[in-house]
Amino acid sequence: EDGFQEAAAQAGGLAREARMTGPHGSQPTAARQGAVCAPMPAGKPSAELGEILQQVLQGLSRGEESGAAPRVAVLLDRPQPHLSNWLGPALGARELIVCSMRDEQDEQDGCPEAEPVEYSGLIGLARVVGFTNQVDLHQALATHGRFDVLVDALTHSPGMRATSAQLFIGIVRDGGYYVAIDGAALGESLNTAGLITRASRSLAGLHGAAGELSGDERSYGEQVAALTVLDGGVVLRKRGDGFVKLRYAETPPILSARYGESWGRSLETLPARVTPLEVIGVTNNPGLCAKRFPRENRIPETSVLEYRDVCVAPRQVLVKDHLLLPNTFRLATTKRLVNTALKELNHYYAAPRVDTQSAPRREGTFFYLDIEYNRHFGHFMTEVVPRLYAWKLARATHPDIRILTNSRADRGRPPAYQRILLEAYGIDDDLVEVITSPVKVDTLVCAMPLMQNGRFADPALASTCHRLRDGLLERSTPNDKPQRRLFISRKPDMWRECLNGSQVEECFARRGFTIIRPEGHSIVEQARMFYEADVVAGYIGSALYNIMFARRPIDVIGFINQSYLATNEYLICSVLGHRLHLFYGDEITDCRGKDCEGRDLGVTNRDYVFNIERDGDQLDELLDSLEETWGES
């Protein structure tokens, strides 16, 4: 992105081409009197450019859509209306989108924000959109859909030309063309060498050349069906379709620009805000805690969106045409959007692993609760529960709305614990509809979750937890002798195993803690036990998420290795007012490769040992203080 911004700054004094509509449907304004934005003088296209176009035209004539007028996009970082005017007719384009780089100071430099087509010298039905950086360009291309031909006439450095091709070939349809015009053909210096080198490396790697390819390099090579190097530039023929990854904030404007009001609507939007986080109590590694956990709770703008005419595929894949809607991504505010049910192409594009275009239609209006890891208790608690807040709004808006999810368990129904949790929240099981393959639906209500691992937790999540807890408690009776102190153990040989866990648990047992394994109890029984506890200790992981059901703010003691990155317990504690005391163990770097379920331990899930000799006294002091706080009950 920095390279795009640098190029925009260098072009600061240059005129922009007109924009008939902006990236999100903005309309042009009249040119100001006295503005001087003269375009480059038109010239006859060179033989080199003609050769490139001939290569593309021949390919289009042989394709599956031969005879159809192509949709063409042109990327420019300076005004070249003569080039755009020549490319459109030469390719027989039915639509020409000119993406023109602009500098943010252009208006102050005498160039109007949007100029009429006559002023810029463009002809025909060309539409011009401006961009200042890589993200702008991504959004502009997403706004205008897939293209048969994308012509890159940017005059960036060779490295940036290579990056542009690797990223934005994703917007070209299967069988289409990405054309990079060399700077020399435009009167500039040669600048496609990096593109040729990078594309060739990816292709060679797929055919057994020495050297390791990254995932993105491999995906790039798989998208290039043919690479042709000509005097005037480079032609890449595209293989496969890319789907655009969308983020929450950019989705409504992009959908509105593409579909008008027919895409759907926003049912609710809550403003972004920042709240303090004061969660950590005692720890044996304050430096790591300060580095690992956020000190501010940066809650993004939160929305409940109602989509129309979308396709839903199992494992949280949500598609409209060739757009991957933001509810596809469980970690939707991270730098890169990823879903393991998708084939990654690059930062901006991915592709479903199943056919979403010919999916059958499922009648009805639905509330979306599917998740990527649909049988995992921890993911359900941290990714479905934080979406339940919108159920009341969805039901008020659509009284006949149903739940849409997917499952591979319990004869096509969600796992029993999920059904019980939903019923406790007030969602009857007969309202839950399960899919096992892609379906298209007329209306789908999707809530952005109130919590995201590693990022934020909205305090509003507390009311959802309380409603869920109270619904579960109605299904059980109080214990005659409630256990006020719980230690949550784990099955042996799971990943992140505390190898001296028996010693740790013995220490807590001597202090009056009851050792339990939650999986041996129903979710209703678990809710009751956690509700009655004043202190909960155990190994960091999904079994501790039941602290959501506590009756009041409690003390939580967690043990974990030093590389584990998830922060769910921390965020849950922040919402409910719990105090988290965290003890890090010493990792075993040469440990086993897989756990008892066949999962790779990798770096973040290594086994560890709690160093009792070094940290035992600190733990004892904490337990002494908690006895004073909570008494001996």
Residues covered by each model-derived region:
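Class I SAM-dependent methyltransferase Rossmann-like catalytic core
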Residues: 32-65
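SAM cofactor-binding core of SAM-dependent methyltransferases
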Residues: 52-127
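The feature primarily captures lumenal catalytic ectodomains
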Residues: 79, 201-633
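A short acidic, Gly/Pro-enriched loop at the edge of an enzyme's catalytic core
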Residues: 141-149
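A short, conserved alpha-helix within the catalytic core of class I
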Residues: 158-166
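Helix-to-beta-strand junctions that scaffold the AdoMet/dcAdoMet cofactor pocket
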Residues: 172-173
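Conserved beta-strand signature within the Rossmann-like core of class I S-adenosyl-L-methionine
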Residues: 176-182
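Conserved class I S-adenosyl-L-methionine
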Residues: 184-198
